[in-house]
């Protein structure tokens, strides 16, 4: 496979520049006959989850294609589902650069992007042009300058706009890079947000005559007590799925490595065991009442199997995909 050569060239560039360049090239391919260049024919391995049928259990995690510009290109690679975003109501530039760093020795990535995106209206236009026949998830967040107390309004604005086009919607309350966002994972703030989202979901279901499931994406840095509270809230509010987990603020496993002291969320192999443990504990707590989508450090068939064994119904990749490329998709889908 050509990917090791592509990776070698990309890894000579700054991490964000390489990311931009890759998306530019994939955007050129999307929706053209040239997608054949990256097409992988993979077996059909359907999984029913959240009331939807996924053509295979492997998805692309949110954050790679924030604006939904390369949906068809990623679809051609064989993903069973693709999650685009995080998108916010209004466009925003994100945090100052540099804001993405490869921790190569640990096969990790640190980012403090800060929900840089072109806004929900732009994303909707891109989704309308896509031809992907798998499940499309859309991950939504709040604008940086929206006070946390008013944060739920941002989620509702995004829901209104994406509902007709989404296979499922993910509520991102776990990015460490938007001030105050993670506070929405706790207690009354979480209950208030989830109640508003479920009410809006019912209204939109009546308006559009279709039910779009809601998933909540959580952090790996939750204590045992916090995790129990989150699980309780998810069940009480009849949330359709939970995505575990986002990036970690913990640096224990990369201490002393280059970029280890950079601020932001750490993803990739260093978060693998922690996210699997969260899935295991969450699964024990939820008892099958809310399905789990496992994400965090999956970089092989073995680590994908570990997430499933811990209680995940579906899995997603991001950092592992950066390090291993399309062959990782084939390895996991063919053998899982």
From Swiss-Prot:
It catalyses: (S)-dihydroorotate + a quinone = orotate + a quinol. Substrate binds at residues 66, 111-115, 172, 177, 246-247. Gene3D superfamilies: Aldolase class I (3.20.20.70). GO terms for cellular component: cytoplasm; plasma membrane. Its main location: membrane. The active site is at 175 (nucleophile). FMN binds at residues 62-66, 86, 139, 172, 217, 245, 268, 297, 318-319. Its cofactor is FMN. Pathway: Pyrimidine metabolism; UMP biosynthesis via de novo pathway; orotate from (S)-dihydroorotate (quinone route): step 1/1. It holds the Pfam family DHO_dh. Binds 1 FMN per subunit. Keywords: Cell membrane, Flavoprotein, FMN, Membrane, Oxidoreductase, Pyrimidine biosynthesis. It comes from the Bacteria. HAMAP family: DHO_dh_type2 (MF_00225). Monomer. Belongs to the dihydroorotate dehydrogenase family. Type 2 subfamily. Catalyzes the conversion of dihydroorotate to orotate with quinone as electron acceptor. This is Dihydroorotate dehydrogenase (quinone). It comes from Erwinia tasmaniensis (strain DSM 17950 / CFBP 7177 / CIP 109463 / NCPPB 4357 / Et1/99).
């Amino acid at each position: 496979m050509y990917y090791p050569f592509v990776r070698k060239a990309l890894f000579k560039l700054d991490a964000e520049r390489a990311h931009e360049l890759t998306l530019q090239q994939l955007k050129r391919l999307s929706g053209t006959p040239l997608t054949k260049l990256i097409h992988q024919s993979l077996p059909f391995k359907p999984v029913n989850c959240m009331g939807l049928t996924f053509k295979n259990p492997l998805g692309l995690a949110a954050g790679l294609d924030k604006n939904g510009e390369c949906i068809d290109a990623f679809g051609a690679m064989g993903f069973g589902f693709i999650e685009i975003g995080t998108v916010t109501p209004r466009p925003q530039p994100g945090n100052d650069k540099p804001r993405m760093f490869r921790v190569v020795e640990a096969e990790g990535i640190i980012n403090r992007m800060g929900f840089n995106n072109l806004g929900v209206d732009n994303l909707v236009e891109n989704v309308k042009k896509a031809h992907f026949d798998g499940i499309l998830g859309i991950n939504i967040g709040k604008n940086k300058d929206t006070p946390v107390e008013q944060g739920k309004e941002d989620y509702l604005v995004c829901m209104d706009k994406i509902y007709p086009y989404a296979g499922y919607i993910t509520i991102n309350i776990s990015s460490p890079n938007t001030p105050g966002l993670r506070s929405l994972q706790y207690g009354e703030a979480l209950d208030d947000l989830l109640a508003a989202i479920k009410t809006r979901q019912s209204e939109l279901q009546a308006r559009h005559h279709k039910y779009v499931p809601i998933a909540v994406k959580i952090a790996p840095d939750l204590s045992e007590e916090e995790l129990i509270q989150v699980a309780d809230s998810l069940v009480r509010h009849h949330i359709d799925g939970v995505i575990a987990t986002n990036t970690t603020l913990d640096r224990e496993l990369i201490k002393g490595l280059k970029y280890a002291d950079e601020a932001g969320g750490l993803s990739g192999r260093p978060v693998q065991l922690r996210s699997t443990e969260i899935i295991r504990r969450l699964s024990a707590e939820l008892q099958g009442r809310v399905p789990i989508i496992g994400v965090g450090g999956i970089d092989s068939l073995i680590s994908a199997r570990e997430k499933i064994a811990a209680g995940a119904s579906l899995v997603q990749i991001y950092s592992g995909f950066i390090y291993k490329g399309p062959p990782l998709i084939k390895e996991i889908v063919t053998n899982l």
